[in-house]
Amino acid sequence: MKKMLYVLVITFLSFTIYSCAKKSDSSSTTATNTVIEGTWQTPCHSSSGYYKLNKLTVSGTNWTDTTEYHTDSSCATDYTKWSTTFGSLSIGSAMVFDSYGSSGGSGAQFTITLSEYTYTIYNSGLVSSNNTNSYCGITDWVLNTAHDVAGKTCGSSTLQSIGTAYYGIYILDGSKLFWTLSSDAYNDSVPTGDNDTFTKQ
């Protein structure tokens, strides 16, 4: 199960799409960073034998998203956390998503640049296992301590390096935010399932 968790977490920036809104028209209007500033959070939900919680904080041109794994259904007991911090947030042209909801949704494309990528373990058994197996090429894992994993190979995946540019799209619906990121190009759709819903805190 741990190996499955590693693979799923490493790819957390590429959401599994159960329902999505496809991007459509863009306009000449440019959105501003302030419309998505704040702290956002998904519901606590089951994922690969654990319970997952995603959080996003946007402040100025900084963007930090975390994927937390917990051992209880209320997401109160920490297990692991992956955190990515980006800078240079730049919002592009406004967009309309005709396939989102009954009246469509509004949003925009944006770009950000990776500035930090960390992994934190809150379970002593997993700390021991990771040290034994040199997970991410690291043998000095410490409980409750974030480790830099940018550019490292963790399991079968090599994580992105600092300075990597990401291309994103978001949909804003009142207090609900949906978004997607890719280091290759803008995705064609945005996940809008219940577990992809970030609610403003």
Regions found by a protein language model. Name each.
Residues 31-63:
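N-terminal segment immediately downstream of the Sec signal-peptide cleavage site
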Residues 1-19:
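Sec-dependent bacterial lipoprotein signal peptides
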Residues 2-3, 22-23, 200:
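Basic side chains
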Residues 5-6, 25-26, 192:
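Intrinsically disordered, low-complexity segments enriched in glycine/proline and serine/threonine
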Residues 23, 29, 59-64, 88, ...:
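Extracellular low-complexity Ser/Thr/Asn/Gly-rich intrinsically disordered segments
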Residues 43-51, 66-175, 180-201:
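Contiguous, well-ordered beta-strand patches that form the walls/edges
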Residues 13-39:
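Bacterial Sec-dependent N-terminal signal peptides
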